[in-house]
Amino acid sequence: MAREYKIEDYRNFGIMAHIDAGKTTTTERILYYTGKSHKIGEVHDGAATMDWMEQEQERGITITSAATTTFWKGRDGKSRRFNIIDTPGHVDFTIEVERSLRVLDGAIALLDANAGVEPQTETVWRQAEKYNVPRMIFCNKMDKTGADFYRSVEMIKTRLGATAVVMQLPIGAESDFKGVVDLIEMNALIWRDESLGAQWDVVEIPDDLKEKAEEYREKLIETVVEIDEAAMEAYLEGQYPDNEQIRALVRRGTIDVKFHPMFCGTAFKNKGVQPLLDAVVDYLPSPVDIPAIKGIDVKTEAEIERHASDEEPLSMLAFKIMNDPFVGSLTFARIYSGKLEKGTSVMNTVKEKRERVGRMLQMHSNSREDIEEAFAGDIVALAGLKETTTGDTLCDPLKQVILERMEFPEPVIQIAIEPKTKGDQEKMGLALNRLAAEDPSFRVKTDEESGQTIIAGMGELHLDILVDRMRREFKVEATVGAPQVAYRETITRQHEEDYTHKKQSGGTGQFARVKIVFEPNPEGEEFKFESKIVGGAVPKEYIPGVQKGIESVLSSGPLAGFPMLGVKATLIDGAFHDVDSSVLAFEIASRACFREAAKKAGAQLLEPIMKVEVVTPEDYVGDVIGDLNSRRGQIQGQEARGVAVVINAHVPLANMFKYVDNLRSMSQGRAQYTMLFDHYAPVPSNVAQEIQAKYSGQK
């Protein structure tokens, strides 16, 4: 079977946004207008096609990034293939956003015209910057009370530090929003309400907007000619680019992430979606427009590139594992190069295991179609893979490569979980392992002392949903303990420790002496090990044992047994015995050496500090600030946003549990908040003593 669509006609993109900016509704409209969804699903009544997990339908928030393939005829009448990845907008799921951005070529950033740039918008925007993803902006909900397109444009500059190139102006706002002015064609599009947005009339620009349209077209041209010398010179000599030249320049600037074309509309009221789809074709990149993906050649360890071509060796990245009720475990993968046929054997170069592709599926949010082969640029779901987890590379066994890995944040919150009955016990273990394979930001461990199962994640909602999924999908009933904070420990001063390990009673003896300087690592939170041994005081082959010994005890600090951050260890001297010394002896010595030193090097407890943003009506500002202060919060600033006030604060996670209930009652349900992990900071001594007493079992 040959390739149906040329790779130049692919658009792999996602929709990223704050929690309520209307992402699922916008995706639904795209599926409706591209003919993939016959009934428009509304999030309000839990029927959206992309939101296919039961809980998403109940909570009205998107949790799993479902991948959907659909098609759209552009302005030129030629059909293009869209692979759309739906991403969640809730802070507890930023890991989902990050991993979908990793495999996208472009994105549409959605703003709520009333709220503008919100905290989560900033978070996903920063993640997109990290992966250099070209973005367009859609200012949604123009029909909402308080909708202000021009304020949103300003906020993109002030809050995101980005350049928005305005491509359309709104005609009317709030309940009077009728259509848009197209600043390239310089005409107006007015939607017909009765046709569910499928039809619109092209009319002249209304008189009261003509001057503004001229002003914004001038700004548009000024911005785009800056990226091309010839166009700039012509412009300065009074020659304006024609419409197709403007489009070509906007495309180039968008793909090079110099600026972001901005559109407006209301997905809910079916206005503005089709011009947005045309813009996806016109301005977002195809797989060949972006730089080739880099990787490491497994044989030579040299950096190599894989270009978006069917002729290159097969390489793909697994970016999501999902449990499908009909097919079992599905691995979503983006094919960067080469071709993949059903039944082929591929190499997982991260796990060093071969995998066989049993079935290959093309997904449409929750319906699926079996396919025989797939090509560069495709996003496919593979059934039958046993070893692969998120972030692994799959490739041609004869041309092995490891593509750039994804980084996943450490969980900040943990809870103990117990099965309700004996029958649930075994099922719970299986369920937790399956969920952990799907979600790399979710960890499962057993507490060595209490024997309890501990689950850790990115926030309360994250863990709630996983426990809920366990009940629904795996029929496991479990009781959940109170959430606990993931504290850390560190050292605050330099200390030199000399330790000798000797065991000479019967059989082979053990001997190792180490002298190590421990100090805070100035370069960050990682552990750093150095050896400054000269003259063979410790033979070279024993030095890895010293490092391994220290690393093995970093997981349990001296104060309350929490993992340690930011330690630097330098081995400066030691001694060995010709017969009794071994790697193991040095491992034991360095382990004991660090345990001794950690107590004397100013051990300190650290706690996760969250960046909290509260949006509240003015009447409740005093109460909100007072409450945040009582939670050991530090107010970073406040600003007016429309009729509301935005309060930014840094607050210890330990004091934020059940905050949502407090905020609701304090503001009669009118205030909202978002919370993100920001950094680790020392715990005040009075609080630290309580924590130590609690975790050292003295209470």
Curated annotation (Swiss-Prot):
Q: Which PROSITE patterns match?
A: G_TR_1, G_TR_2
Every copy of the tr-type G domain together lies at 8-288
GO terms classed as biological process: ribosome disassembly
Concerning InterPro entries, the annotation shows: EF-G-like_DII, EFG_II, EFG_III, EFG_III/V, EFG_IV, EFG_V, EFG_V-like, G_TR_CS
* GO cellular component terms, A-Z: cytoplasm
Name the SMART domains for this protein.
Answer: EFG_C, EFG_IV
UniProt entry keywords in alphabetical sequence: Cytoplasm, Elongation factor, GTP-binding, Nucleotide-binding, Protein biosynthesis
Q: Sorted alphabetically, which SUPFAM superfamilies does this protein's record hold?
A: EF-G C-terminal domain-like, P-loop containing nucleoside triphosphate hydrolases, Ribosomal protein S5 domain 2-like, Translation proteins
Q: Where in the cell is it found?
A: Cytoplasm
By its UniProt entry, which Pfam families does this protein fall under?
Answer: EF-G_D2 (PF22042), EFG_C (PF00679), EFG_III (PF14492), EFG_IV (PF03764), GTP_EFTU (PF00009)
Gene Ontology molecular-function annotations? GTP binding; GTPase activity; translation elongation factor activity
Instruction: Indicate which residues the UniProt annotation says bind GTP.
Output: 17-24, 86-90, 140-143
Could you tell me what this protein does? Catalyzes the GTP-dependent ribosomal translocation step during translation elongation. During this step, the ribosome changes from the pre-translocational (PRE) to the post-translocational (POST) state as the newly formed A-site-bound peptidyl-tRNA and P-site-bound deacylated tRNA move to the P and E sites, respectively. Catalyzes the coordinated movement of the two tRNA molecules, the mRNA and conformational changes in the ribosome.
Please give the family membership noted in the entry: Belongs to the TRAFAC class translation factor GTPase superfamily. Classic translation factor GTPase family. EF-G/EF-2 subfamily.
Q: Which PANTHER family match?
A: RIBOSOME-RELEASING FACTOR 2, MITOCHONDRIAL, TRANSLATION ELONGATION FACTOR G-RELATED
Protein name, per record: Elongation factor G
Q: Encoded by which gene? A: fusA
